[in-house]
Every structure is written in C-alpha cells, then in structure tokens.
Amino acid sequence: IELNIKTISVLERLKTGKKMNCWWCSSQRRLELSKYAQEHGFNKIALGHHLDDILETALMNALTKGELAAMPPVLKFDKFPLTFIRPLCLADIPMIIRHAEMQGYISSTCTCSYQNNSGRKTARSRLDKLTDGNYELKRKLFDALRNVNTAYLP
C-alpha cells in the first residue's frame, strides 16, 4: 500500500474561544481520512487504537459522562460507505512494544502540547491500577463491554 502523507492545519479550524483537545483534533483527522478514502474509492479505514485505548476511553466516558461507551472494533456508517476498523483492538501496549522491537520498527512519541487537556493520562493510570497491567484482566474488561447483562443493571 502506498504511503501518502497529508498535512492538515487543525489549529486553524478551531473556533474562537474553544480549547484544543485530543477528541476534537482526532475527529478532524478522521474527517480528513474519510474524505481521502472516499475520493480514492476505499471503503475501509484501519485505525491504530489498541486494547488500552479502548479501555481508557470506556473509563473516561463512564467517569466523566456517566456513559458506558468506548470505541468499537468495527464501526460502519449509514450516511456514507465507510467502515472504520481497529485491528489492534486485542493488543495491549506491552504487546505492541514487543512486536515493534522484534520487527525493528522506529519508535515515536506524541509530542502534542495539547495532550494535557485530555483525561487519557489519568484514565491510563486508573486502568493500570485496576488491572496491574495484566493482559487477561484487560481482556475481561473488554469482554465485559461486549457482554452487557442489562437485566442486572439499574
């Protein structure tokens, strides 16, 4: 697959009086990915969200919005012919790091100065306290998101 890099000016899209945050920035990137995919006849977009991302998002939504929601492994849209897939949804961070090291991939770190406006670091810390980094416990949490027994919920 050919690598194409597209630079977008997310800051220029920010409305006056609004704060930059990870959610808004990522939605702008997904919008551009969607446009690119449709312009080139693609119907699937693979995103790099992994198990920890999904569980952190679930914790953030539960603890800030009182909502049980995360990021589904497959998200098909009705309004346009695109499906977002998350092929790394069952891989946690240590697994990805091990694989990257074995393959000799170059490591990169997010240096966005706006990441402090996100609750993800706190959610990551809470997830680590909850699971002690144990992959099996993370998988149980992931499975719980998919196996909701509403008869035993308020």
Predicted regions and their residues:
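The feature marks non-catalytic terminal segments
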Residues: 105-154
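A conserved beta-strand->alpha-helix junction
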Residues: 1-16
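Short, well-ordered secondary-structure micro-motifs
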Residues: 15-16, 57-59, 151-153
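Surface-exposed cleft-lining segments at the edges of enzyme active sites
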Residues: 16-22
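Short, ordered loop/turn segments at secondary-structure junctions
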Residues: 8, 50-52, 112-113
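Active-site adenylate/phosphate-handling loop in enzymes that bind or generate adenylated species
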Residues: 23-95, 141
